[in-house]
Amino acid sequence: MRTIGLDVHKRFAEVAILTSGASPARRRIATTPAALRAFAATLGPQDQVVLEATMNTWAIAELLAARVGHLVVSNPLRTRAIADAKIKTDKVDALTLAQLLAADFIPPVWIPDPPTRALRRAVSGRAALVRQRTQLRNRIHGVLHRNLVDAPVSDLFGRAGQRWLSELALPAAEREEVAAGLRLLAPVDAEISRAEGRLAQGALADPRVALLMSIPGVGSACALGLIAVIGRIERFARPAKLVSYLGLDPKVRQSGERPAHTGAISRQGAAHARGVLIEAAHTAVRTPGPLRAFFGRVKARRGEQKAVVAVARKLVVLTWHLLSRGEPYRWAPATLVRTKRRALERAAGIPARRTRIGGSLSARERQQQERAILQGAEAAYRELVSARRERADAAAATGRDDEGQRPKMRGGAPSPRLRSSLRGQAASGGEA
């Protein structure tokens, strides 16, 4: 069996081949389809190949995977932590990868299937267009700020806002900068609409999107972004694995007999997914329900910013439960879910249709009824947390936990059972 490491670059890849009982063989191949197919023809089912995740990794992996018995894509950050070296060349890197794979030390990356890769490209393409639009809008805002001008409209880039901008009296150079920004915005807005239309058509056919959109604050963009990053939910055995994968788990530092120190979130994984989760959390806490109650509880102790991050983490836990069970969020407001669905249909180009919802209640009455139910759930959450806190305080005062056991002290710290009791376990399963 041969073990082959590839250090991949834009135009070439350095190859190191390990064979039992022989010196390593080295070669360089071009990263063109023809050269890669010729290299793949020299491989067999007894070979195993490793390469690091880069921009062109997936195309190379797709060409080689059918010819070898085992192909691994490694995580560059974790590989560097395992095999950092003073001498770093392409040949050394390729050989190091092969040696790590032979020793079974490679931290692998999941190789997404073609539909997931296509969704990732579509989501990242839309995100890039949105960033371009934001830059253009910020340039126009900068012109107004430099000239001490306040816009009289709430939507500066709507029809009324653009008409006001075109008539605004400014110095010639500043006026031309605003006009150029508006001219550039038009095609970018059109491309964003087309990209969102294509994404919406795929989202309507994906039942996972409907499940995630049942969560308050989670729209189609957030749902698609999460699905693109997650792929198959079966990859994650429990919610904590998904939280860690998205970089919302806290950093932990512990050495010797010192207690563990928990710091800020790790920020590993997909930054775009964390961004849309934070945006969704800001929206979710404005809707009555257990999520808003949870936000208020954390905000009172840790401040608003940390509370928003805690809600984002809770959204990830909810995502794991909903996708694993195939069930919508229990406290999903039906009217809000229908509104999200209709917005998705409009983006996909589906014409409006008149539907009649059963019952004698008007739309406003249904919304008020749903709001009352959610406010009741929010109040029930607060009562649950308050009752558990009272039990924890009583247990701490008597020196016994909820099961009547006297806790064992370890170096001045309470036992895990008492720590669990003192925390109160305020979060309920996958519901908040």
Predicted features along the sequence, with ranges:
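A detector of single, family-specific signature residues
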Residues: 1-432
